[in-house]
Amino acid sequence: MASSVWQTELPDLPEPKRGKVRDMYDLGDAYLMVATDRLSAFDVIMPDPIPDKGKVLTQISLFWFDVMKDIVDNHVLTAKVDEFPVKCRQYADILEGRSILVKKVQPQAIECVVRGYISGSGWSSYKKSQSVCGISLPEGLKESEKLPKTLFTPSTKAELGEHDENISFEKAAEIVGPETAEKLRDLSLAIYTKGADLANEKGIIIADTKFEFGTTDDGRIILIDEVLTPDSSRFWPKDQYEPGRAQDSFDKQFVRDYLLEIKFNKQPPGPKLPQEVLDKTRDKYLQALKLLAGDAYSI
């Protein structure tokens, strides 16, 4: 079985800031971003890592960062461990394939969510109010149906363990400023459209996703964090797509479904996950990487 990394311990580096999945090391003039194999569902970190998950997330993100270069710059400096600062290279066996040296930027204060299909919380909202995040939709939509128009539905950025809160575009404009909000919306829709079209050709429907952006010292908005991964997006197999029901997926929806089945209360600590759930989730992540990126970004 593949080895897994629950959290990184790199003694010669500063103490990292740990998020749900990533450990961020402040190296002074750059960050070392390491994707662990932690998995969170319903904003709760599960106690069992998914082997190789962090590597898959990193390689998929690197693939998309490259694909999207003509739309927006990104924060990647290098993903080659032998180009990292010398003090990092001793940890090559841990860092290889799951880490990126990234530029320091000021993160934007909102999450940029894009929805191309109606699913998850969007579907729940539609059933109650025929709207998603305050945006009215036509009646008669089925679960998992392609939306008449791709939606930009921003949210607040919650602290670890808290829930992101959906907000209107107007509220987003209040938080980041009208001009920046428009720029974030336009970039998000452009990236999603290009990504969804390319993924569709490779047999994956990207139902929805979440982007993060940052601002450089010279005022440019760039793409940061992760891009169109099974953690930040809903990936559905195109050959099994059937509107009117919840879809099979390449992402952690498999874990979410299991947690709903056991009536998990969505409060920490997360429950132990059965080996079968861990294995199947790992397989789904690997399958998504292979379909999207082929062998160029294999782990």
UniProtKB/Swiss-Prot annotation:
Disulfide bonds: none annotated. CDD domains: SAICAR_synt_Sc. Keywords: ATP-binding, Ligase, Nucleotide-binding, Purine biosynthesis. GO terms for molecular function: ATP binding; phosphoribosylaminoimidazolesuccinocarboxamide synthase activity. The keyword Transmembrane helix does not apply. Pathway: Purine metabolism; IMP biosynthesis via de novo pathway; 5-amino-1-(5-phospho-D-ribosyl)imidazole-4-carboxamide from 5-amino-1-(5-phospho-D-ribosyl)imidazole-4-carboxylate: step 1/2. GO terms for cellular component: cytoplasm. One of its GO terms (biological process) is 'de novo' IMP biosynthetic process. Its EC number is 6.3.2.6. It catalyses: 5-amino-1-(5-phospho-D-ribosyl)imidazole-4-carboxylate + L-aspartate + ATP = (2S)-2-[5-amino-1-(5-phospho-beta-D-ribosyl)imidazole-4-carboxamido]succinate + ADP + phosphate + 2 H(+). Belongs to the SAICAR synthetase family. HAMAP family: SAICAR_synth (MF_00137). This is Phosphoribosylaminoimidazole-succinocarboxamide synthase.
